[in-house]
Amino acid sequence: ACLVGSEMCIRDRYDVGNSAYTLLACALIPIWYKSLAVGDGAGQISSDRATAYYAMAIAVMTVVSALIGPVCGAIADHMRIKKAIFSTTVVVGVSACILNGFTPTWVLFLVIYVLTKIFYNASLVFYDSMLVDVTTKDRMDEVSSYGYAWGYLGSCVPFLVSLAAYICGPDMLGYISNRLSMIIGFAVTGIWWLVVTIPLFKSYKQVNYVSDAADKDIHKNFENDAFIRDNIKEKNKTNKNPGVLRLIADAFAQIFGTIKKIATKDKKVGLFLVAFFLYIDGVGTIIDNCINIGTDLKLDSVGQVVFLLFTQIVACIGSLVFGRLSQTYKTTTLLYVCIAGYFAVCLYALTLHDLIGFGIMAFGVGCFQGSLQALSRSYFSKIIPPENSGEYFGIYDIFAKGASFLGSLVIASVKLAGGTINVAVATMAIFFAVGFVFLRLADRYDAPRHENN
């Protein structure tokens, strides 16, 4: 385990901070948004339209985050300014989070929510890539797992404050309770997010980065590409600060080159990313639809939140257990166990008919949720070049952002065909099965020279 005060433990505190916002976004933000958007008042809309606009906002956020993540990561790797950019994304994200509680209209609420999520997601690119700087490869699994564990547990603290304001507010504050609960929820979460991150601001040092010699080789290779060379020259002619433009253009060019390298040479990384996309899509879809299952079982919103907190606590324990097991077993072995566990959870969904069964399913999800995410992060850290960790995690983040995309389409198709939500969730077993196969292929593939797993 991380020693208190060590840089590894300090790094893990950001999991505690950002997870608080994740939990708020999952449980309460949709409720607050609907309270502003739905109704017969001026500027308000129907519930269906509100849901559609919310989905559109999430789509915009996902696309923007996927585009800027790799670029920012590549720039940070080359300019050795990972901490500076990370700090900026956190401060802007926290500020937007707190401001979100004071928004008077649902339109402004959505705009600021999207802004918060974009900077939140950008911060995760840099945070995940810091793993290669704060620990050795033989401890990455443990450190990553402990980060997720404390994140699940620590996020409950500000969330319980927000939940208390939301539930108890009507009895104590009457008409203004919902507005005040929003202000309290966003403010407490934002302050928590920032305060627990301050030690990381102070202590983190970027150890791995692209050397000047490697940077020159990259530039030389880019100059051999006529399209990239001509595009950069043309833009530099019309820009008063060609250095900045050149940096951005080179970042895009490098990302293109890295993707090409992954597809043609670094196939271990490529196969893992395919596996990750499939099984993490299944994870995201199940999480998203647990609430729908609870609704079908006549579980009210408070009961659903209670089960959500229960899952968080179980996920904390599961991450700690798998973190300890990582000292004895290979990362891929533990990933196989987690994927198989989720496969079983999907099939178990077919038998759900009461709240006891729903609780068992929530327990199963919690056991493997954090562990699968943490071990995926640490395994990826081991098989990529550490000096390009920011850029690679930007690409990793694109695959993570796709979580629940394909699964949601499958869920919708099954429901439209007349199937139950139980059957729809059970179909997610296919994603875990195919993801398992691709992970096996990645595990057997020759490791790149930078891996030491």
Question: Could you say what each language-model-derived stretch is?
Answer:
Residues 45-48, 166-191, 413-432:
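A membrane-interface helix-boundary motif in multi-pass transporters
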Residues 84-99, 333-348:
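Structural signature of the two symmetry-related core transmembrane helices
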Residues 26-51, 288-304:
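Short amphipathic helix-loop junctions that connect adjacent transmembrane helices
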Residues 192-203, 426-453:
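Multi-pass alpha-helical transporter architecture, strongest
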Residues 6, 206-273:
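Juxtamembrane intracellular "pre-TM" segments in multi-pass secondary transporters
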Residues 2-10:
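Short, small-residue-biased leader/transition segments that mark boundaries at the very start
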